[in-house]
Amino acid sequence: MRHRHSGRQLNRNSSHRKAMFRNMVSSLVEHELIKTTLPKAKELRRYAEPLITLSKVDSVANRRLAFDRLRNKSTVGKLFNELGPRYEGRPGGYLRILKCGFRAGDKAPMAYVELVGRPEPVAEADVSAED
């Protein structure tokens, strides 16, 4: 019986899950938009949202906690220098999960995970039109 067991197993052992979500959060912070399967996207919220909440208060202790979970100095820097101030007035709900169909090989449901309020990339056609 699986009473009081929270979180998805995703057919991985605990160390593999931990490493996978550490890498996924790092990619999300770096690129602000990633594509993954829907169950992984839903589980990613449990790892990413507390880190963004942590980054709202920039202190040495919070940076060390974030580094302990991410193990990437540049990602921690972006988390505290850009994302923390961006979501200062937002009480939660930093991620948006958008379903985007099914994967070609195995029909797994896919989803985009993006940070809410991320700056829109400037299209190359717009840049050339201005010149």
UniProtKB/Swiss-Prot annotation:
Part of the 50S ribosomal subunit. Contacts protein L32. GO terms for biological process: translation. Belongs to the bacterial ribosomal protein bL17 family. GO terms for molecular function: structural constituent of ribosome. Keywords: Ribonucleoprotein, Ribosomal protein. This is Large ribosomal subunit protein bL17. SUPFAM superfamilies: Prokaryotic ribosomal protein L17. InterPro entries: Ribosomal_bL17 (IPR000456), Ribosomal_bL17_CS (IPR047859), Ribosomal_bL17_sf (IPR036373). Pfam families: Ribosomal_L17 (PF01196). It comes from the Bacteria. It comes from Teredinibacter turnerae (strain ATCC 39867 / T7901). PANTHER family: LARGE RIBOSOMAL SUBUNIT PROTEIN BL17M (PTHR14413:SF16), RIBOSOMAL PROTEIN L17 (PTHR14413). GO terms for cellular component: cytosolic large ribosomal subunit.
